[in-house]
Amino acid sequence: MGRKKKKQLKPWCWYCNRDFDDEKILTQHQKAKHFKCHICHKKLYTGPGLAIHCMQVHKETIDAVPNAIPGRTDIELEIYGMEGIPEKDMDEGRRLLEQKTQESQKKKQQDDSDEYDDDDSAASTSFQPQPVQPQQGYIPPMAQPGLPPVPGAPGMPPGIPPLMPGVPPLMPGMPPVMPGMPPGLHHQRKYTQSFCGENIMMPMGGMMPPGPGIPPLMPGMPPGMPPPVPRPGIPPMTQAQAVSAPGILNRPPAPTATVPAPQPPVTKPLFPSAGQMGTPVTSSSTASSNSESLSASSKAPFPSTAQAQVAVQGPVGTDFKPLNSTPATSTEPPKPTFPAYTQSTASTTSTTNSTAAKPAASITSKPATLTTTSATSKLIHPDEDISLEERRAQLPKYQRNLPRPGQAPIGNPPVGPIGGMMPPQPGIPQQQGMRPPMPPHGQYGGHHQGMPGYLPGAMPPYGQGPPMVPPYQGGPPRPPMGMRPPVMSQGGRY
């Protein structure tokens, strides 16, 4: 069994009790501080060597080691680094070192314990407030957003609206609104709509009188509600606006005629812009146009699929050259182009009734088509067909026929009196004679006429629909540009 090695002491200077990391550094320290000649600054290796140097070179005697602590100035001791240190001093140094190490360990332990305590306290404090904060944060939202839905829809759980403001209220909230209409529909709708994000709906409801305003919404809603289209975003807004108008206007019987026109756009949220453009024209249109718009509106809300098909045809219409001419006439025609197709079907059937009526109707349809397009643009998309018919009528063949009757003034009056439909009536027979070559065009004209309902009567119905002429005035720029000839040139372009 080998002896336990004594713990090695860190190098330290016996003269000044200073510790060093390396013994080499210790020797350099001793040579510079303790064994240096104070006269010539020569560095010696031991105390006795310094004494001999001074005695021989400088003829001086040195009794003590310079820069040494009291009690360790003995110059006779030959110490070099850690060698030559007395044993008792070595033991004392070990003891001191052990004490220092113990003290340092205790301090470290205390520091560590203090740090742990601080960490624990900080962690505990941090953990405690965290749970409290979330609770407080959740409680206020429960109270604030929960309050509105609670009175409106007692069945709704208070927590769901705040947590899921967008979708949850819609899904569960809408059913309660339907049955809850009588008790507190207004509040329910306002809050649910506010959560859904339909801000417009809420103000509209607020504007409407307490009870009567909303009931109209409900009858209008069932057809639109089954498809989720109204909820998504803009469509609901347009519907809300339209509903508010009819709600107020439906009460007086007279305004109902104008009201139906806005309703179809509401049912067609897909094309709100077209609906808005159409609304002013409907006001200008006469009762006949209103009745037609009513029929169209009744068709439009239910046959949403038919409208979609019409829209599909619209692109085909875009390929059709009529679009080019329609822009020349006015920006409005492109919008109504889609509705024209739906009406065109009815018009085609009516046109088949009589070929003779078709030519006359087609001739008059030029102005009428524009009027119908402007009026119907709100509800349907017949502009494309109308433009085609007009363009075809404007073709050189058709115009040539007009002068042939010999009643050129009569042909011109329709152009000039676009505002007045009566003058064209006397010239209708002549135009009818010209129309025979235009039977196919008559079909297109029938489509246009189908919108206003002029198909059965051909020219006479067109005369009945003078109000339609004002909408056609939107097209007048063509006649003024060159009477019939310039329009014919446009048709030639087509």
UniProtKB/Swiss-Prot annotation:
Main site of residence?
nucleus
Region of interest: GLEBS: 375-407
Q: Which UniProt keywords apply?
A: Cell cycle, Cell division, Centromere, Chromosome, Chromosome partition, Cytoplasm, Cytoskeleton, DNA-binding, Kinetochore, Metal-binding, Microtubule, Mitosis, Nucleus, Repeat, Zinc, Zinc-finger
GO cellular-component term (any)? microtubule
Query: What PROSITE patterns does the annotation carry?
Result: ZINC_FINGER_C2H2_1 (PS00028)
- The answer to keyword Ion transport applying to this record is no
Region listing for Disordered, in residue ranges:
100-161, 250-377, 455-494
**Region (Microtubule-binding region) residue spans:** 1-92
Annotated Pro residues bias: 142-161, 463-483
Amino acid composition bias (Basic and acidic residues), ranges on this chain: 100-111
Q: What's said on domains?
A: The GLEBS region mediates interaction with BUB3. The microtubule-binding region is required for efficient loading of BUB3 onto kinetochores and proper mitosis.
Binding partners and assembly: Interacts (via GLEBS region) with BUB3.
Give the protein's biological function.
Kinetochore- and microtubule-binding protein that plays a key role in spindle assembly. ZNF207/BuGZ is mainly composed of disordered low-complexity regions and undergoes phase transition or coacervation to form temperature-dependent liquid droplets. Coacervation promotes microtubule bundling and concentrates tubulin, promoting microtubule polymerization and assembly of spindle and spindle matrix by concentrating its building blocks. Also acts as a regulator of mitotic chromosome alignment by mediating the stability and kinetochore loading of BUB3.
Q: What is this protein called?
A: BUB3-interacting and GLEBS motif-containing protein ZNF207
Species of the source: Pongo abelii (Sumatran orangutan)
